[in-house]
Amino acid sequence: MNIGIVNDLPLAVEALRRTIALRPEHRVLWVATDGAQALDFCVAQPPDLVLMDLVMPRIDGVSATRSIMERSPCAILIVTANVGANASYVYEAMGAGALDAVDTPTLEQGGSADPSQPLLAKIDQIGRLLATRMPLAAPAAAAPAPQGALPPLVAIGASAGGPTALTALLRRLPDDFPAALVIVQHVDQAFAIGMAQWLDGYSPLPVRIARQGSVPQAGEVLLAATNDHLHLTSRGVLAYTRRPEETPYRPSVDVFFHSVVDHWKGEAIGVLLTGMGRDGALGLKAMRTKGHYTIAQDEATSAVYGMPKAAAAIGAASAVLPLERIADQLISLVQRNRQRWR
């Protein structure tokens, strides 16, 4: 991949160069020392991937990410000195379209752990995502389960741009919303707890991480919280699984949506928000085929129009809506939750 580096610290740039040099398939295309220069470089020489710092002069990493995604979209990985200490900025950057975040590697060679490996793992993961052209294979469909006395389930998938889209959606829901919500957002497990707390600050409904054995409850939002795939079991409870192993992103939206089709015995609504790639498109299609109402975010309001675009292209969405209309549509649908939504 051709990689752009955005960082104003010479030692950090050198550490990034050395890490990239470990893989012959990658090369440094350019180095920018602030967000304004990065935007100019992205327009003039579009990279496959940008390694974006957060704290820089003139234009910071969050603003630069937003500007790049508006004018010259590409994959962006936040690489900063201390991700944990900058968690709120990380979520803002991911809301603007960044795919993930990782600490800047150091030049120190002491110790048993290789400081370059976390960054290389993230680059490899994004490389697989960019290389994916075919949709993921769908799990075999189970026979439709009889409907039971369960709350409606709103299954939501999101990736790049998701944090901002999720806050905009959740804050529009009433605090007595009578459905259960489960979110699969492409985010590393290191950030999941912090993201749940961050979303909780915007949402009238409580937002918690989904744990092994959690049961979706009306009026509660559960967020996938590990690098394994969140799914519903045959008992209708949430669990995590490593399979399928080869997926561009973990957790997978497709895996969760297919498990809703197979194992949720009540009504369900599928929502696919902004994101890069195709994850969730096949699962949303399966939900619609099962008779559930499905929504894809429109292009105009998506930070990255990849996942919802793929869903719309295969007829997976009952409706393609701007972000600001999705909450109202959910409220309306849940009020009529015993009707057939097709």
Swiss-Prot record:
One of its GO terms (cellular component) is cytoplasm. The modification 4-aspartylphosphate is found at D53. It is found in: Cytoplasm. Residues 144-337 form the CheB-type methylesterase domain. Keywords: Chemotaxis, Cytoplasm, Hydrolase, Phosphoprotein. One of its GO terms (biological process) is chemotaxis. The keyword Cytoplasm applies. The active site is at S159, H186, D279. One of its GO terms (molecular function) is protein-glutamate methylesterase activity. Residues 2-119 form the Response regulatory domain. Its EC number is 3.1.1.61, 3.5.1.44. The keyword Hydrolase applies. InterPro entries: CheB-like (IPR008248), CheB_C (IPR035909), CheY-like_superfamily (IPR011006), Sig_transdc_resp-reg_Me-estase (IPR000673), Sig_transdc_resp-reg_receiver (IPR001789). Contains a C-terminal catalytic domain, and an N-terminal region which modulates catalytic activity. Belongs to the CheB family. Involved in chemotaxis. Part of a chemotaxis signal transduction system that modulates chemotaxis in response to various stimuli. Catalyzes the demethylation of specific methylglutamate residues introduced into the chemoreceptors (methyl-accepting chemotaxis proteins or MCP) by CheR. Also mediates the irreversible deamidation of specific glutamine residues to glutamic acid. PANTHER family: PROTEIN-GLUTAMATE METHYLESTERASE/PROTEIN-GLUTAMINE GLUTAMINASE, PROTEIN-GLUTAMATE METHYLESTERASE_PROTEIN-GLUTAMINE GLUTAMINASE. This is Protein-glutamate methylesterase/protein-glutamine glutaminase 2. The lineage of its organism: Bacteria, Pseudomonadati, Pseudomonadota, Betaproteobacteria, Burkholderiales.
